[in-house]
């Protein structure tokens, strides 16, 4: 219910404590649409917006990430560096989060390889290919390594945020047909009402 969500958001803003908003981008995009109609809010200092899960079934509404950040910053009153995205998948059990410079950092215990889609050879930093995600995070599962259909590249230069871990950039999806991941369920539930 958009009206109740906006009322609650205004109530949180009046309370003055930092707010954490988390959700899939299409749901947040819908919220921003309501804020365009009703007027922007100013979230308290130290507030964050964290998205994750991709656009899935709402791919027809997808906007460029930079535009999304600019709109969210303007309508929520928080700086773009406090608007972050998360990347991950149910099969992998380890999240990758953007820093304030909007680069996905690889946690110390993980590895990310970029593989050529045809030969599967490991590509050097700066070359795009399929992302292979490796983690010992859940040794009880047989998915210590997952070769995704997501296309990305390891960034060749250190991140200007100051964190020293490697970073990667998503550049698209591989394959000829769209993969429906676990986040699709939330969107399907909302569409069914």
Give the ranges of each region predicted by the language model.
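Active-site glycine/GP-rich loop and adjacent strand/helix microenvironment
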Residues: 1-193
